[in-house]
Amino acid sequence: MGCTVSAEDKAAAERSKMIDKNLREDGEKAAREVKLLLLGAGESGKSTIVKQMKIIHEDGYSEEECRQYRAVVYSNTIQSIMAIVKAMGNLQIDFADPSRADDARQLFALSCTAEEQGVLPDDLSGVIRRLWADHGVQACFGRSREYQLNDSAAYYLNDLERIAQSDYIPTQQDVLRTRVKTTGIVETHFTFKDLHFKMFDVGGQRSERKKWIHCFEGVTAIIFCVALSAYDLVLAEDEEMNRMHESMKLFDSICNNKWFTDTSIILFLNKKDLFEEKITHSPLTICFPEYTGANKYDEAASYIQSKFEDLNKRKDTKEIYTHFTCATDTKNVQFVFDAVTDVIIKNNLKDCGLF
C-alpha cells in the first residue's frame, strides 16, 4: 500500500513537470531574444547600420523600395552642391570660371521646386555638373571641414551622369549612402544564428536624446557608433563643440550609466575609410592637442580607441568590445556583426550559467 502513488499526487507531479517545462522554454525563448540599442552622436552611421541589417539579414531592398529612395538621392545631391556653393561666399572662394556665378543663381532658383517634386530635371543636372567641375567649387569642397556637408556629397556628385538618367533606379549602395535625419525611434527585427534581434535606432542629435530613456529596460547590448572622421568637425547643432568631444562625452555617460551595469557595450569606430583619407592632411591635434604620434591611420585610430576605452570606469568588471567599421561596406559590417553576435551568445550563456 505504501508504494502506491495516488492519482492526485500523479496529477500534481505532471503539473509540476509541465510548469518546469514552460519555465525552461520561456527562459530559452528569452535567451534567444536580443534587444540591441544603437546609440551615438548625430551622423555617426547608426541608420546605415540598420540599412545593412536589412541587406544582410532580410534580402535587401526590392526594386520598388529602391525606387522610393530616388527623391532622397536627388535631395541629398542638390543639398550637397548648395552647401558647397553657399560656403564659397563665407570662405571667400571665387569660381575659377566667372560664368559659373550664373549657374549658381540657376541652382538656387531651380532647386526648391525640384526638391518639392522629388525630381532632377535636365537643366538642373546640367547646372550641378558644370558647378561640380569648377576648380573653385573643388577647392571649397576640399575645405569641407569648415562647414556642414553630407559624407555622401562626393559619392553622388561624382556619379551625377548615372543619377541624372531618366530611368534611374537607386542601387543598394545608393540607398546606403542616403542621409535622412532620424527623428524618434526606428525599430528593426531580424533573425540570425537562431537569435531574434530587435534593433532600435535612436536619433543622435541632442534634441532627440530625451527619447532614449524608455528604451533602456531589458537591453541585451548597446552598439555605440562613433564617426572617426568627425575629429576635425563641429556639431550641426552647436558650432562651438567638436564632434569627437561630444561623442566622448556621450559615450562616458552611456558606458558608466547605472542602467547599463550588466549590458554589453560594443563600440563601432565607424567611417574608417573617410578617416584614413583625411588623417594624412588634417592632423589629429585639431581634436587632441596632446597627441604626439604620427598622422597615420593605424597610430591615430589606436589613439582614438584608447581615448574612448579609457572612459570606462569599471574596467575590472566591464569590457568594451571595439570594432573598426565602414558602415557603407556590406562585407565589413557582415564580418563585424558576426563577431558581435558571438559575443552576445557567449554573454547570454554566461548569464544562464552555461559558460
Swiss-Prot record:
Q: Which family does it belong to?
A: Belongs to the G-alpha family. G(i/o/t/z) subfamily.
- Name the gene for this chain: GNAI2
Q: What is this protein called?
A: Guanine nucleotide-binding protein G(i) subunit alpha-2
Report residues binding GTP: 40-47, 176-182, 201-205, 270-273, 327
- Organism source for this protein? Homo sapiens (Human)
Which residues get modified to ADP-ribosylcysteine? Answer: 352
Can you locate the S-palmitoyl cysteine lipid attachment residues? 3
Q: So what does this one do?
A: Guanine nucleotide-binding proteins (G proteins) are involved as modulators or transducers in various transmembrane signaling systems. The G(i) proteins are involved in hormonal regulation of adenylate cyclase: they inhibit the cyclase in response to beta-adrenergic stimuli. May play a role in cell division.
Q: Where is this region: G2 motif?
A: 174-182
Q: Where is this region: G1 motif?
A: 35-48
Processing after translation? (Microbial infection) Deamidated at Gln-205 by Photorhabdus asymbiotica toxin PAU_02230, blocking GTP hydrolysis of heterotrimeric GNAQ or GNA11 and G-alphai (GNAI1, GNAI2 or GNAI3) proteins, thereby activating RhoA.
Mind listing the UniProt keywords for this protein, alphabetically? ADP-ribosylation, Cell cycle, Cell division, Cell membrane, Cytoplasm, Cytoskeleton, GTP-binding, Lipoprotein, Magnesium, Membrane, Metal-binding, Myristate, Nucleotide-binding, Palmitate, Transducer
Annotated region described as G4 motif, given as residue ranges: 266-273
